[in-house]
Amino acid sequence: MNEGYDKIVEAETQNFRKLWFLDRYLANHDGYIAGGCFKDIFNGEPVKDIDIFFRDRSEFDRAKRYYERNEDFALAYDNDKTIAFRDLKSTSGIVIELIKKTFGEPIEMIETFDFSITKFAYYMEETPFDNEEDEDDDGTYMKNKIAYHKDFFEHLTMKRLVIDNKLDHPLNTLNRSWRYAGYGYGLCRESKEKLVKALQAVPEREIDFGKDFYDGVDW
């Protein structure tokens, strides 16, 4: 574990069967899934959209080409932040969003998310074989892994919005807290105080509640 991410837990996926359907969306590219869809999955709610992130632009470009050529998916929309495809085989009409505005490693990425209940990632990691006889030419294989905030499940059950890192874009965070409030989630006392202090430091000229607060990380 990276010492800089001491609040993040890493684990294998064999005990998380309800996540296995996500393998369909990790096939044939090197992206990873992160963000709000895990809240819906663990709450037993329908998953409407899945956010797929990438370590760099070239990974995004390869995934984009794959979905453009895949007849099981249809273009849903495209803007400067994401390109989205609808899964035509999904009974619930799942839309996958390929994020093209921000890039990084899975744990690095979820650490930038506002709330602990969004800090969850599902990804593939190159892993050495335990048995040398099973090794391929590289001596490694791809293993499914997850990474999540250590309090993810507790805060999800309590419907608590907890901010535990620096607020670089407090207006964005405020906007997202309103959205989550519509689903019954509320800021804890400490997070309210942190958000208020951060908002007080925002220059008045930058405050515009009618604008789109999205700044590339809206999960």
Predicted regions and their residues:
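Catalytic cores of the polymerase beta-like nucleotidyltransferase superfamily
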Residues: 1-219
